[in-house]
Amino acid sequence: MPTPPCPCGRSESYEKCCGRFHGGTAAAPTAEALMRSRYCAFVQGDASYLLRTWHPRTRPARLDLDPGMRWTGLEILDTADGSAFHTTGTVTFRASYRGGSLHERSRFERVDGAWVYADGEFLD
């Protein structure tokens, strides 16, 4: 039986995709990869990963995820910078959930060489 694809939308299995980042065996190499892994963490309810990958300057003291929230898909709409050669980047995306969607432009920065989520701007 084929392995289901990662919730982030890539065709790889969770273990070969975002699971490596969640488990700490690899770091997201780009801002988009971090965005996808953070979406996947929301799907899985992994608040500790979300906090770990949040910029220390903007990170909340705690994060309470709604256990009833059902995320249903991620669409990357645009990326700017955020590669291995950049220190900042943005990812514009639409994340769908049961009953609606979230449209955001997220800003990412490198801290000690690792990509972290800095903040985001809700769109429409």
Swiss-Prot record:
UniProt cross-references to SUPFAM superfamilies, sorted A to Z: NTF2-like
Pfam families: YchJ_M-like
InterPro entries per the UniProt record, alphabetical: NTF2-like_dom_sf, UPF0225, YchJ-like_M
Domain of life of the organism encoding this protein: Bacteria
Protein family according to the UniProt entry: Belongs to the UPF0225 family.
Protein name: UPF0225 protein SCO1677
Organism listed in the record: Streptomyces coelicolor (strain ATCC BAA-471 / A3(2) / M145)
